[in-house]
């Protein structure tokens, strides 16, 4: 009862409506194999929802019969009878094209599914018949809706507000696909929270008293069903303007392996069991060509793997595997480890990536905490101990429920119905994003050529939420710029293939020339593009505007004119609306960062050649206040400086 009392003490319920129908909030931890749901309602702080079988987690599976949808264990039962209509592990397909390596791997592992191209969105569809298809987003929406029904039954009231966990390595397309699925289910998404951040938040909430001004560095190693992610988190108290001294967690480093997880071990063992059955020659047929039998073997492989984590050997057995033929074979832990030797060799890579990205050494890490079901495999722990060099690995959090509990704490903090003690979260964007554009320059021989420019918008591991502004100083006519992912050289070749296109969107600005013609008597201060990366890690282009100022001899009231540009940015990335505004009691504003300057033009090189001139320019700029936020709206002070020196 102690943890419950602790949480009850932390939650101060306020602003409760007299009608409690819509007060409760929920979280959904979307795993590849399991879904965990948690709720907060008046009198019930941070509780895991029990499903209809009174279990604390539900298989992430859905079966579609003619007039019925089956979820969880019922769906898994249908997988043996009719695998073509039972869908699992489809989160790997979110936001991906048919030629993506992960989609191709999915087809190879689960040949019972017929995947086709969505001609409208160029993503993936499950084709059940000539007239019936489902997108992964639609299937995920059904799972989310079912999760909502479990939460409502448990809470005994309607639930709409939700925080959903996503893998930290999800890119913009994958995050928007999850958001679209939530919209299809009718849920109001308060935030998409990275699952590693949710785990870190849950850990910090229950150890609030242990956090002080001295930084504590904790490494979380999470090996789940489909992937592995290693996160370095720094905990310490900081002083805030609004609420005094509060605890904060900051994501310092992240390393991951998209395809290293428990499912890969299951698939190896499944294929080994299929080989053993064929060698017994009890049937003339190849069991690998029978999808129902292969689903039975996959289920048995998962069971045997779990038992071998605590035993040296075990008997795999299935009644009526194929053609009423029973299967029985002994499997040893050594055999399993030999089958997966190359997988275990990959255990250390996420740790090394996390340390490198955080620019830290293992000696600076105070403890290593295990998260995720696959970390229970003894060989995984053995390899992990070698790479971290610690005497032991900590297992002091609930590996299954930590993400769901951290996410529901965040949901309560963002809800207007509850007031919680602040816990500041400084998340980090794993992938850098940059703006690219071309402009015409004059060469020494007076000929003209196009010069390609790059401007870093968000660097790797840049904290968010955060706003930034880029100013284009030398355009006087319509132009376009591209928003792309930045330098991803730290990813391997296979990861880059999975990542897909590096282009997020191309923005075409219309009306620039017309604005300049109408205000030829005004001084141009450039064209400003305002970007926002919100609490969900989603990037949006808020607006683009041309900024003009009157000359000194004109009337003071005409001191500044902002001209909005008609352009194609009303929905920058498409496929889903932006996340609704949330309270700022758990996230904190991000301070400005320096950015890499663009390559100077010939004229600028000449201007900066004389040190005295350079110093004078610096002083002039200081007097003029040429920052990214030098405009009428004082409320944009948090926006970053990002002005290309064209």
UniProtKB/Swiss-Prot annotation:
Gene3D superfamilies linked to this entry: 3.30.30.30, 3.30.420.40, Actin, Chain A, domain 4, Substrate Binding Domain Of DNAk, Chain A, domain 1
Compositionally biased spans, kind Acidic residues: 590-610
Region described as Disordered: spans on this chain: 572-646
GO cellular component: endoplasmic reticulum chaperone complex; endoplasmic reticulum lumen
GO biological process, one term: negative regulation of hypoxia-induced intrinsic apoptotic signaling pathway
InterPro entries: ATPase_NBD, Heat_shock_70_CS, HSP70_peptide-bd_sf, Hsp_70_fam
Subcellular location: Endoplasmic reticulum lumen
Keywords in alphabetical order: ATP-binding, Chaperone, Endoplasmic reticulum, Nucleotide-binding, Signal
Skewed-composition ranges (Basic and acidic residues): 611-646
Residues forming coiled coils: none
MF annotations from Gene Ontology: adenyl-nucleotide exchange factor activity; ATP binding; ATP-dependent protein folding chaperone
Principal location: endoplasmic reticulum
Signal peptide (from-to): 1-22
Any Pfam family matching the protein: HSP70
Protein family: Belongs to the heat shock protein 70 family.
Function: Has a pivotal role in cytoprotective cellular mechanisms triggered by oxygen deprivation. May play a role as a molecular chaperone and participate in protein folding.
PANTHER family in the record: HSC70CB, ISOFORM G-RELATED (PTHR45639), HYPOXIA UP-REGULATED PROTEIN 1 (PTHR45639:SF3)
UniProt protein name: Hypoxia up-regulated protein 1
């Amino acid at each position: 009862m102690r943890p419950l009392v602790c949480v009850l003490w932390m939650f101060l319920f306020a602003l409760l409506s007299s009608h409690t129908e819509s007060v409760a909030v929920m979280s959904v931890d979307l795993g590849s194999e399991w879904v965990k749901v948690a709720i907060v309602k008046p009198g019930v702080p941070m509780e895991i929802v029990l499903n209809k079988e009174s279990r604390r987690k539900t298989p992430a599976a859905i079966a579609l019969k003619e007039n019925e949808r089956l979820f969880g264990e019922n769906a898994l039962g249908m997988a043996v009878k009719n695998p073509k209509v039972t869908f699992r592990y489809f989160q790997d397909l979110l936001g991906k094209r048919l030629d993506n390596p992960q989609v191709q791997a999915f087809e190879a592992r689960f040949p019972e599914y017929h995947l086709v191209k969505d001609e409208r969105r160029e993503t993936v569809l499950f084709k059940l018949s000539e007239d019936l298809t489902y997108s992964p987003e639609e299937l995920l929406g059904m799972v989310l809706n079912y999760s909502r029904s479990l939460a409502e039954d448990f809470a005994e009231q309607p639930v709409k507000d939700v925080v959903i966990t996503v893998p930290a390595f999800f890119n913009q397309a994958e995050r928007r696909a999850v958001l679209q699925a939530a919209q299809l289910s009718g849920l109001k998404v308060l935030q998409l929270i990275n699952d590693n951040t949710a785990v870190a938040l849950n850990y910090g909430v229950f150890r609030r008293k242990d956090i002080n001004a001295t930084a504590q560095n904790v490494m979380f190693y999470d090996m789940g069903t489909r992937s592995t992610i290693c996160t370095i988190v720094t905990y310490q108290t900081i002083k805030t303007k609004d609420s005094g001294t509060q605890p904060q967690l900051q994501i310092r480093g992240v390393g991951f392996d998209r395809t290293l997880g428990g499912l890969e071990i299951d698939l190896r063992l499944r294929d080994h069991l299929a080989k053993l059955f064929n060698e017994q020659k009890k049937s003339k047929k190849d069991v690998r060509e029978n999808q129902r039998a292969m689903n039975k073997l996959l289920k048995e492989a998962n069971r045997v793997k779990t038992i071998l984590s605590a035993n040296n050997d075990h008997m795999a057995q299935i009644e009526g595997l194929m053609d009423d033929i029973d299967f029985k074979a002994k499997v040893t832990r050594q055999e399993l480890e030999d089958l997966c030797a190359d997988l275990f060799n990959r255990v250390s890579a996420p740790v090394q990536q996390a340390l490198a990205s955080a620019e830290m050494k293992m000696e600076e890490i105070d403890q290593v905490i295990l998260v995720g079901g696959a970390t229970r495999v003894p060989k995984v722990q053995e390899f992990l101990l070698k790479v971290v060099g610690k005497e032991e690995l900590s297992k002091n959090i609930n590996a299954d429920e930590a993400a769901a509990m951290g996410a529901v704490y965040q949901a309560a903090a963002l809800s207007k119905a509850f007031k919680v003690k602040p816990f500041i979260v400084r998340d980090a964007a794993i992938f850098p994003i940059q703006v690219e554009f071309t402009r015409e320059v004059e060469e020494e021989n007076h000929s003209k050529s196009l010069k390609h420019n790059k401007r870093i918008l968000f660097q790797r591991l840049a904290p968010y939420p955060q706003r930034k502004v880029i100013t284009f100083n030398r355009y006087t006519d319509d132009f376009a710029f591209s928003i792309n992912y930045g330098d991803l050289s730290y990813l391997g070749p296979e990861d880059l293939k999975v990542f897909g296109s590096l282009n997020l969107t191309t923005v075409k600005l219309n009306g620039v020339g017309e604005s300049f013609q109408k205000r030829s008597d005004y001084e141009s201060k450039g064209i400003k593009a305002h970007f926002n990366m919100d609490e969900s890690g989603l990037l949006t282009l808020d607006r683009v505007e041309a900024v003009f100022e009157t000359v000194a001899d004109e009337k003071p009231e005409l001191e500044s004119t902002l001209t909005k540009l008609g352009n194609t940015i009303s929905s920058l990335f498409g496929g889903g609306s932006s996340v609704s505004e949330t309270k700022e009691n758990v996230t904190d504003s991000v301070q400005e960062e320096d950015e890499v300057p663009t390559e100077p033009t010939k004229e600028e090189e000449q201007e900066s050649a004389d040190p005295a001139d350079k110093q004078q320019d610096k002083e002039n700029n200081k007097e003029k206040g040429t920052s990214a936020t030098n405009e009428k709206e004082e409320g944009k002070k948090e926006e970053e400086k990002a002005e290309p020196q064209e």
